Structure formats: C-alpha cells, structure tokens
C-alpha cells in the first residue's frame, strides 16, 4: 500500500512500545524491506562499489595479505548467507560479502598494476616502444613501454611523453629514443581535487614529460609478444583512422569527429569544448550510451528492415537474431576503435541485454541489466569507481531507467502523437540526465549548465540523423578509400552542432561556476539518490534526507584562504573582496586555473594577478589578513626578516629556523606535501598528500 511519508512515519512510531519509539521505526523499515525483496538484488552493485570505494578511501595502503583475508571473508559470508537465517539476514550477509569482494578486487588491481614511479624531475635520454598515440593541440603525446634509461636503474613500466618535432614519423610499435624532461605524474592541485597521479598509476604510467628535439628510431629491447602485437595493431589502426579523419576535415570538425569515432579528444579546441559543455552537449564528445545506442540499435533496425524486405528470409529464418548478432559485432568493433572508456564499456555490456529484451518483447532497459553492467565493470577495473565518467554515466542511466518505468505506465493511459512523444522524449531525457549528473558536474568540473534541454532539443536530431550515420558510413568506407563523402557530411553536421552550442552557451545565464564542496557531500547525495531510484514504495522518499544533508554539507563548506602549489612559487591568497588573488603571475598555470574554478570564480588567472592590499618587492610579498601577517618569500635573503615579523611564512627557498611564526612552510616541506591549503580562522594547514594518504601513487620524497 502506498502512503505519504508523514502518515507512514506516524504509523511506524505508533507501533513501537512507549519509551521505545525506534522499535516502531525499525519494524516499519523491516516490513517495507520485505515488501520489496524482489529489488534487493539491485543493491549488490552498490555494495560492490562501496567496497572498492573503501579501498581507495583508506588512509594507508593495505598490505597484500589483506586481499587474501578479504577474499576469505567473502567466502565465509557467502556460506553464512546460505544458512537457515531469515531472508533479511541472508540479504545483509550477502551484501557484506559483496562489499568485501569489492575491497579485495580493488587491492588485487593495485597489486597487478604496481610499478616504479618517478620520484623527482630529471632530464634524461631514454628509449622505449610506442604503444599509444594521442594528437593534441600542443603536439603528439606518446605512451612508451620497454623503457630504458641510463639514469634510471629501475625505470617506470610506461611513460607519457609530449613530442613536438618529427611527430609525423612516429607509429605504434616503433622503437624510439629521445631526450626528455621527465616528471612524476601530477597530483591534485589542491586537497580534494581530481587525483591525476592515481589515474596515471592505474594506467601503468610512472612518469610524464616532454621531449627536446625529435625522436630517433631505435631497436626494440625485446620482440613483442602475441598480446603486444594485437594491442599494437589496434592502436595503430586507431592512429591511422585519426590521421585520415583529420586530413579530410578542418581542425575543429576533424578533432570532434575523431573524438566521436576513435575516442581521441586531445585535439579539440578548448573554446569548442567549452561551448558544447556549457550548452549541455558535453556527452557528444564522450563515447557512451548515446553513441552505442545509435550504432547498435540503429544497425539492428536497419539490418532487420533489409532482411524483412526479402520474404524468403523473413518467413523462414530468425532475422531478428541475425540483426542482433550484426549489431553486437558492430558495437564490439566500435568499442575497440574508440578506446573502451568506462562509459562506452558500460553501454556495450548493456547492449546484448537490451537486444535480448527486444527479442523477448520486454523493456530494453532495466535496473537489473544496468546493475549487471556495473558489476562487470567494477570486477574488471575497480578503479572505475573513482572516475567522473563512470559515476556520471551510471547516475544518468539509472535515473533514465527509473523515469522510463514511470513513463511506460503513463503512456498507456495518455496516448499522444509520435512527434509529441519524440520531442517530449528528448526534452525529458536531457532534463533527467542533466539533473542526475548535476552534483557530479559541480563537484568535478565546478559548473552547472542551465539550458541543457534547449541545447539537446536543437542538436540531438542532427546527431542522431546525420552525425552518427555518416560516422558509421565513413568507418565502413575507409578500407576502400571512400571515406571523403561521408566525412564531409559528418563535418557539416558537427559544424552545425558547434554553431548551436555557441548559440546556447552564449545565452545570458547559460552556466554558473560553482565552488568546490567536500566529497562527503557528494557521497551523501549519491546514497540518497540511490535510495530513491532503487526502491519503488513510498519509503523511497526517505532518500531525500541524505540528499538534503549533502546539500547542507556543500553549502557549509569552508573555502581555503590561501593555496600553495607544490613548486612553492604559485600562491593564491583570498583578498579583501573575498576572491582569490595571485601575488605574482603563477608558475603553475594549470593549478592556478583549477583554484579559481574550485573557488566558483570564472575569471582567467591573468585577471586575478595582484591586489591593492598586497605589498610586493623583489624579495617577496607581505599581506595582512584577519590580523595575521603573511610573508611570501621568493628569495632566501628575506627569510630572516620575514621570520621576525610574520605570523605565517611561506618560502620558495629552504626554510631557516623560525621561532615567531605560527606557521612556517619551506620549499622542501611544500614539495613533500604536494602543496597546501590554508584557512586563517581557525589557522589550519592541510597538505595535498596528507589527504591523499600513504598510497603507492603518492610521491612523498622531497623534490630537490
């Protein structure tokens, strides 16, 4: 029976004994849970994801034996859940078992990918085998394995190098030698920011950098094995397709066409990307369910229609199964050439389930198929749980499935014309997906778009009817050298989408830059949203409580008054106007841009340099904030005077003994901490690496 929240709460409480009000609540929760026992299975992916998240949230790296212990606990809990308990106890034991499994597989992935990580910057000559190419606006980024270097007795398994000269001569599988500036993979720009070092670690990359001059061809350290030859063939095919697309289309259209076909986004103009993102069209660039549905489902209906036109085949053979098989093979090829991102893999895993449902005349999308896709992804690649693409993709699809269930019931009651349903479907899909991904977009990218529905209403017909069909035709025509015409059509449609994106993103109030908030707020909102989406009875609306708590945590978040990058020379200080300012032009411009974005400030860093209350000279800068004197020393000559008069000393040089300051940070301490965020009231300094914890991807050795 469906009832409102308050009547339900009063009924639960009244059923408890006097003085034991929680008993009524617990009994009410138990009854609601038993009524929805058929949906308990939907919480197993949540338990698995929670276990993997616990691993990544650990403050120190668990020792290897913990993985074995967790697997043993998993087996024990599974065995216990099969005993003669009541169904609710068995479900709880199964959930705990899956949670421990998630922790174990995450640790096992770390053990599988663990390798040497560069601890300090250096210039060295190195050689290696090219395993991946990514063309960008600044040049060619290559991934090298079989790395050898005289200065590195234990080199990283893979390094990522930017090459600007002679890049046209490099191909996948080739051995190259070059002189490069190598650096450790970058960490977060501030506590709580995206951890790029962790992403590099789980991609097997132990160093990044750029080359001096052109790369030279060198012999390989060892011949490639069968798997290396296969992956090399795939990457070489992707690279050749990328070059052929860009040779046929102008820069902007070619870069976006490449992103849609091969998944390579490095060459997209930042202004074009910003226009699409602020118009609510960022999903066009990230291969996911939209692309896979247009390829897989579109090809299914096309092949089925073609076969149905032949009476002998239509009457005597299972043409729907044939069409489904062709669709799955095509989608598999698409995911291979597109790089197999988390969102694309999720969509591909769901495609056979969707087609099977269509063959059985059942709803194509369901929470169970989505949950199975999540389980497969998390078991194969647990680090996906930390990636924005994974989180946003599943949030959007889960919300769309929940709304689709409601829509199917409503559509039977209120029939409408095909055109009305089509327009309403695009608008509702855009609205639901935008709302579901809003917390993640605000947390990771600091932006909230307001005209996503309009952008999608204008651009999606072009995407579905022209862009994706012409992309499929161009790929099919490439082996015959006939891709020019379909690529030109694709370029025309992309130009149209860019024009629409610029129009929508240029409307007043199209986007709001939002300040950063703590991870706990995002977790609370996510758990509340899952409670609402995965249950069906009225108790689902109790999920609004953690959602409201998460919003409150986000609104109450304290912003840092001072930020220091790991180079100790890039510093931002909150001014009297409440905004961040840079005493001097920042050396680490990426960090500077991230700080402003996370502060909810849409300014370019160039517009934030200097402030009236800052006093600077050749030795450093002095500021007075909240009654505290802050000295930012850029040369060692000023340290003695700064230590005598300042409450906070930040030095780009090694620190001398300082007695007076309440807080003193020198270059080595700042580098070892990976940067700092400081609040003045109360005075507190948090290092980036302290928040990251003692993990294999965290570099704690001081930079010399």
Regions found by a protein language model. Name each.
Residues 65, 73-74, 80-95, 209, ...:
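Hydrophobic alpha-helical transmembrane segments in multi-pass membrane proteins
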Residues 2-58, 357-358, 473-484, 488-491, ...:
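Hydrophobic alpha-helical segments
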Residues 36-80, 387-390, 394, 482-533:
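Membrane-embedded alpha-helical segments of integral membrane proteins
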Residues 62-63, 104-119, 552-565:
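Aromatic-capped interface at the extracytoplasmic side
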Residues 165-168, 172-175, 179, 198-205, ...:
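Non-globular, low-confidence helical/coil segments that flank catalytic cores
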Residues 1-38, 85-88, 99-283, 654-663, ...:
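Membrane-interface helix/helix-cap signal primarily in integral membrane proteins
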Residues 451-460:
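Non-cytosolic membrane-interface motifs at loop->transmembrane helix junctions
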Residues 51, 128, 180, 260, ...:
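Divalent metal-coordination and catalytic microenvironments
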């Amino acid at each position: 029976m469906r009832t409102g929240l308050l009547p339900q709460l009063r009924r639960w409480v009244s059923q408890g004994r006097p003085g034991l009000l929680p008993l009524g609540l617990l009994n009410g929760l138990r009854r609601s849970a038993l009524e929805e026992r058929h949906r308990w299975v939907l919480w197993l992916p949540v338990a698995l994801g929670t276990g993997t998240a616990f691993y990544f949230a650990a403050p120190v790296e668990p020792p290897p034996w913990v993985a074995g212990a967790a697997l043993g606990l998993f087996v024990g809990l599974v065995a216990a859940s099969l005993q003669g308990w009541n169904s609710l106890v068995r479900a709880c034991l199964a959930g705990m078992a899956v949670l421990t499994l998630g922790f174990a597989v995450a640790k096992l992935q770390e053990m599988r990918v663990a390798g040497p990580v560069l601890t300090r910057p250096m210039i060295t000559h190195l050689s290696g085998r090219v395993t991946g190419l990514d063309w960008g606006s600044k040049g060619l980024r290559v991934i090298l394995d079989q790395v050898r270097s005289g200065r590195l007795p234990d080199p990283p398994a893979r390094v990522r190098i930017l090459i600007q000269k002679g890049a046209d001569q490099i191909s996948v599988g080739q051995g190259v030698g070059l002189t490069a500036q190598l650096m450790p993979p970058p960490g977060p720009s501030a506590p709580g920011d995206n951890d790029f070092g962790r992403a590099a670690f789980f991609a097997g990359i132990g160093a990044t950098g750029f080359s001096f001059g052109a790369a030279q061809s060198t012999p390989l350290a060892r011949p490639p094995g069968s798997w290396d030859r296969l992956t090399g063939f795939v990457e070489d095919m992707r690279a050749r397709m990328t070059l052929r697309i860009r040779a046929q289309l102008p820069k902007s259209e070619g870069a976006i066409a490449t992103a849609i076909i091969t998944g390579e986004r490095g060459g997209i103009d930042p202004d074009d990307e910003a226009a699409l993102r602020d118009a609510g069209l960022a999903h066009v660039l990230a291969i996911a369910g939209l692309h896979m549905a247009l390829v897989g489902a579109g090809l299914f209906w096309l092949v089925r229609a073609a076969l149905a036109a032949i009476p002998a085949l239509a009457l005597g053979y299972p043409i729907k199964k044939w069409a489904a098989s062709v669709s799955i093979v095509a989608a598999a090829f698409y995911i291979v050439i597109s790089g197999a991102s988390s969102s694309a893999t999720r969509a591909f895993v769901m495609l056979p389930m969707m087609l099977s449902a269509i063959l059985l005349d059942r709803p194509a999308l369901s929470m169970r198929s989505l949950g199975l896709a999540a389980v497969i992804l998390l078991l194969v690649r647990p680090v996906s749980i930390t990636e924005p693409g994974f989180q946003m993709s599943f949030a959007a699809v889960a919300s769309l499935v929940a709304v689709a269930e409601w829509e199917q019931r409503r559509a039977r009651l209120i029939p409408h014309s095909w055109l009305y349903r089509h327009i309403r479907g695009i608008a509702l899909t855009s609205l639901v997906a935008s709302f579901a991904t809003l917390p993640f977009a605000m947390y990771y990218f600091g932006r909230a778009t307001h005209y996503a529905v309009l952008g999608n209403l204008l651009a999606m017909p072009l995407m579905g009817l022209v862009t994706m069909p012409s992309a499929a035709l161009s790929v099919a025509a490439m082996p015959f050298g006939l891709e020019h015409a379909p690529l030109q059509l694709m370029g025309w449609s992309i130009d149209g989408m860019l024009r629409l994106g610029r129009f929508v993103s240029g409307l007043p109030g199209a986007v709001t830059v939002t300040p950063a908030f703590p991870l706990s707020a995002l977790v609370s909102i996510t758990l509340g949203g899952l409670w609402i989406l995965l249950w069906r009875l009225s108790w689902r609306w109790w999920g609004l409580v953690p959602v409201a708590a998460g919003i409150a945590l986000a609104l109450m978040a304290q912003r840092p008054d001072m930020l220091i990058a790991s180079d100790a020379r890039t510093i931002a200080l909150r001014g009297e106007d409440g905004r961040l300012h840079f005493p001097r032009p920042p050396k680490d411009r990426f960090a500077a841009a991230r700080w402003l974005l996370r502060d909810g400030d849409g300014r370019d860093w160039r517009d934030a340099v200097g402030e009236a209350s800052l006093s600077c000279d050749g030795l450093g800068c002095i500021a007075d904030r909240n009654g505290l004197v802050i000295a930012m020393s850029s040369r060692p000559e000023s340290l003695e005077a700064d230590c005598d008069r300042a409450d906070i000393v930040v030095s780009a040089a090694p620190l001398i003994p300082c007695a007076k300051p309440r807080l003193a940070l020198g270059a080595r301490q700042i580098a070892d901490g990976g940067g700092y965020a400081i609040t003045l009231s109360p005075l507190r300094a948090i290092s980036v690496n302290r928040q990251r914890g003692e993990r294999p991807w965290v570099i704690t050795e001081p930079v010399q």
